Structures are given as structure tokens and as C-alpha cells.
């Protein structure tokens, strides 16, 4: 499973609350992504910050993509509810699953997850999008 995540409203948080709060938000995203990847992987897994406010995750898991994405959504919701910050930390996520025997590369899956992420951003939703590799 490949996820491409992009933080929502980093510029607004930086402008209103300062860069320390923006950095806090970026660390929060990394922590939540790492917690879920560590908990759900059945093989190797990795979370990487790939630029600015974007993260990529790749993991082997037997969990259905939609369930894993719901766990991420729930984790962000809980963290925001428990936070004393005057803002919520949210991400938009694109996802692509590689099936055993799939001929597509990890780079293909990351590219497709990235395309889906920007579809989500274009629709201005804090949601996840899914795309089959056959796109």
C-alpha cells in the first residue's frame, strides 16, 4: 500500500501562529503516520517526508486500504480533540494498493497516489481518494 499525504493549511498555521507551530504540526503528522505504519505493517514499511508538507508511506499490510485510511482519519481526529492548540492538524491523502504479482512499480503507485491526492485537494476535501493501478 502506498500513501501520499499532504498537510492542509500549513501556510495559514505558520502565518497565524508562527513557524514553531507549523513545525509542531509537521512533527504531529509524521508521528501519526509512523504509528499507523508501525502498527499495521506485516512486512517492511517506511514513512518519509518528501518535501515541504508532503509525506509518502509504503507498507505491506493485510488490512484493506479503506480500513487503514479510516484508522488514519480517526488518529488525526483523536489527536485534534486532545490537543490544546487553536487549530486542527489535517492531511489530504491519496492511496494506491499494489497487489501480489502486480507488474507496476512502487514509483508507479506513488505517482498514482500523488494524482489522487491532488484530486482531493482540488475538491477541497479533507478526505482520501483511491485509484486502481489500471488508470
PLM features per residue range, with description:
Residues 4, 90:
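Generic enzyme active-site microenvironment
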Residues 37-44, 80-83:
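Alpha-helix termini
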Residues 62, 70-73, 77, 81, ...:
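Catalytic-core segments of nucleotide cyclases and related cyclic-nucleotide turnover enzymes
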Residues 1, 8-35, 48-52, 56-57, ...:
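Conserved long alpha-helical elements within nucleotide-processing catalytic cores of c-di-GMP signaling
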Residues 5, 96:
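Cofactor-binding loops of NAD(P)H-dependent oxidoreductases
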Residues 43-49, 87:
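A short pre-motif secondary-structure segment
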Residues 3, 134-135:
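Active-site core of bacterial EAL-family cyclic-dinucleotide phosphodiesterase domains
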Amino acid at each position: 500500500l502506498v500513501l501520499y499525504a499532504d498537510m492542509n493549511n500549513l501556510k495559514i498555521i505558520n502565518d497565524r501562529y508562527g513557524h514553531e507551530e507549523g513545525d509542531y504540526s509537521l512533527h504531529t503528522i509524521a508521528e501519526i503516520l509512523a504509528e499507523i505504519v508501525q502498527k499495521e505493517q506485516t512486512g517492511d514499511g517506511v514513512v518519509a517526508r518528501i518535501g515541504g508538507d508532503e509525506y509518502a508511506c509504503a507498507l505491506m499490510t493485510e488490512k484493506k486500504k479503506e480500513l487503514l485510511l479510516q484508522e488514519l482519519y480517526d488518529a488525526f481526529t483523536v489527536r485534534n480533540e486532545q490537543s490544546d492548540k487553536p487549530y486542527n492538524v489535517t492531511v489530504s491523502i491519496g492511496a494506491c494498493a499494489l497487489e501480489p504479482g502486480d507488474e507496476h512499480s512502487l514509483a508507479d503507485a506513488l505517482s498514482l497516489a500523488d494524482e489522487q491526492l491532488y484530486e482531493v485537494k482540488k475538491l477541497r476535501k479533507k478526505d482520501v481518494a483511491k485509484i486502481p493501478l489500471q488508470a
